[in-house]
Amino acid sequence: MFDVFGNFDSVEELNACAKGLLEEQDLEHLKVLAEENGIPDGIREVYEQHLSEELVDSVNAAIGKLQVELKEETDGMPAGEIVSYLSMRCFEKEILARGVRRKNRTLKECLQNIRKEAEKRVKERRGAQMVAMPDLEVFAILRMYQVCQIG
């Protein structure tokens, strides 16, 4: 994950790198850049053909990052549903998309936050070994986390 070009802090950084590669006609590395950042081939190809001024917008940059991080996630939590929810929210709020793209924001961190809240709820219910949290409660935790952490 982000092995060749690293984790970009913004869509602007990602697009600047893509612009440099395109100007150098280094399509091989442009493909690597897109793959590392979860950018679909179709979007990359449109950019390569100079049909778009930028490789990606903030929403696609965020969704791409989430998809890349999802492939790495192995802790057993229902990460796919969380990525779907966050992706939908990125379409609704560009500030969230920009926040997701930040280097210091990760899917792993979101999942850890949900796990901490679940563990807290287990402690509150004496004798409970686990707690079931409906999707809407998990999404409410994500919304609360987003409000506190975006920036």
Regions flagged by a language model, labelled:
Residues 1-82, 89, 150-151:
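Low-complexity, interaction-prone regions
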Residues 61-119:
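Charged, amphipathic alpha-helical linker/scaffold segments
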